[in-house]
Amino acid sequence: MLDVWEGSDVEHIPQITDKVCILDARRYDWFTPAAHKVACGAVYRKSCVKDIRFSDDLYIGEDTLFLAECIKKASKIVRSESELYYYYRNDQSVTLCDYFTGKLTEMMAWERIVVLYANESLVQKTAKAGYSQVCRELVVKYGKSARFMEEGYPKAKAGFYRWAKEMMQQQLQEKRYFYWLKTMYSYFFWDAWVKKKQGE
């Protein structure tokens, strides 16, 4: 375990003892929950992060885009369930606060990931599904905000529909039937689904 919080003692584990999974970076699945453990949940080779910077124009999603750019340069990914960092949760962080316009940059980040993998159709398909899911989640989180409904809702709705079929295919492939049904409902009965979410 590494605790890198300022002023803390650093404790090292001599080796990782749990099972690890080695993945081909050219088959990375952006739709799995593990794909979203993003920048703070990864250890990188120097060769993968060289010349990559966090995007200044993104308030949310900059870490996901950073991870995508690193994976694009990698050949393999090793996934471990070991907790190697203490994660400090800041209740005032930008990701946990109420809606503001900067939250929409998460869609921009996912659009860039889809473009980044334009020449890798398998990976791009999962990125499209991830993008559609992010759009749907924005409506779930901020659908009660009048400001979101004015500023972000049209783009979130269009983004969801643009690649919702890829998302539903991924859900079926992964046997996530409950989520597939929820997505189908929102796909075919969007307006009723939004009103339901606003009433919750």
For each of these PLM feature ranges, what is it?
Residues G130-R136, L181-S186:
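Amphipathic alpha-helical surface "interface" segments used
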Residues I52, L58, A74, R79-S80, ...:
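Gram-positive cell-envelope targeting signals
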Residues M1-I77, Y88-T101:
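Donor-binding/catalytic cores of nucleotide-activated saccharide
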Residues L67, E106, W110, K128-Y131:
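Short runs of predominantly hydrophobic/aromatic residues within well-ordered alpha helices
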Residues K144-E200:
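Membrane-interface aromatic/basic loop that binds lipid-linked glycans or pyrophosphate carriers
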Residues S82-D91, L96-L122, E137-L138, Y142-M167:
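Catalytic core of nucleotide-sugar-dependent glycosyltransferases
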Residues Q124-S132, P154:
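Short, charged, amphipathic alpha-helical segments
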